[in-house]
A protein has these predicted regions:
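Short alpha-helical transmembrane segments in multi-pass integral membrane proteins
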Residues: 50-117, 159-213
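Interfacial/gating helices of multi-pass transporter permease domains
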Residues: 14-33, 100-104, 164-165, 207-211, ...
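Helix-loop interface residues and adjacent transmembrane-helix termini in multi-pass membrane transporters
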Residues: 5-8, 16-19, 53-56, 131-132, ...
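Small-residue-rich hydrophobic transmembrane alpha-helices
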Residues: 11, 22-82, 119-138, 230, ...
Length: 253
């Protein structure tokens, strides 16, 4: 709910800048979502493996699963961040983005896409808190991040007049704060690292991928379908109003 609220707030605030800014951010987020699917494979599988081992009284193995998920998502996140930051313009041109949206979408994709590793790490630490029963603490990180996002959006848009760059910067800062909060809470509240149970890392990783891949595949199919829809809509006009209308509708629906 709070992630959806964040998107709605960004859209409403950007609408005060221009409709094309809304369309540019909506288009960029669609393609960021495709890359983020990779993180879901590990995080969803990691949650299942951690839950199984906590239920079986093996918190040490649950900690191992967290560590494996953290390393895998961190490496994948850094790689995707570099790709999106360096090749943002080429990616958007390859998907036939409307010329009127290109500059704003490229700016957003460079900044937010370049910080995709945050999207890779936040679910790892949030899930770690939730499976050990600290659901409220995970929520605190999300709420604080959203509040900071709203405040920074207001400052960057209406005081500094940074437009799309301001919204992108606010998004990255708020996610960084969210990550710091959930990571710190996990380190303070959960002592699973001290438990003696251990398992072969290769076996745990195989379990994570085996469970996570099917659950992420459904989301992957949906997101890929959305990218084709957005591409077709961009090809239908040069001013990007079709994808702008879609961005508004997606936030309202």
């Amino acid at each position: 709910l709070f992630y959806m609220l964040s998107g709605m707030v960004d859209t409403l605030m950007l609408s005060s800048v221009s409709d094309q800014a809304v369309g540019a951010v909506g288009t960029a987020n669609t393609y960021i979502g495709v890359f983020i699917i990779m993180f879901g494979v590990i995080s969803s599988g990691m949650v299942a493996v951690m839950s199984q081992n906590i239920g079986a009284g093996r918190p040490g193995i649950a900690y191992q699963a967290r560590q494996l998920g953290l390393v895998f998502n961190a490496l994948t996140g850094i790689l995707i961040s570099v790709v999106l930051a360096v090749f943002s313009g080429g990616i958007l041109r390859a998907v036939s983005i409307a010329p009127a949206l290109l500059e704003s979408a490229e700016t957003y994709l460079k900044i937010v896409g370049g910080a995709s590793f945050l999207n890779a790490l936040i679910p790892i630490f949030s899930s770690y808190l939730r499976v050990f029963g600290y659901t409220k603490h995970s929520l605190i990180g999300t709420v604080v991040g959203n509040v900071i996002n709203i405040i920074l959006n207001s400052v960057f848009l209406f005081v500094f007049h940074w437009g799309v760059m301001g919204v992108a910067t606010a998004t990255v800062i708020s996610k960084a704060v969210n990550l710091i909060i959930v990571a710190a809470m996990g380190a303070v509240l959960i002592k699973a690292k001290q438990s003696p149970e251990r398992e072969q890392p290769r076996r745990i990783l195989a379990q994570i991928v085996k469970i996570g891949f099917p659950s992420a595949f459904e989301t992957a199919l949906y997101n890929v379908a959305m990218t084709f829809i957005v591409r077709f809509m961009n090809q239908m006009d040069t001013d990007g109003m079709n994808v702008t209308a879609r961005s508004y509708a997606m936030q309202i629906a």
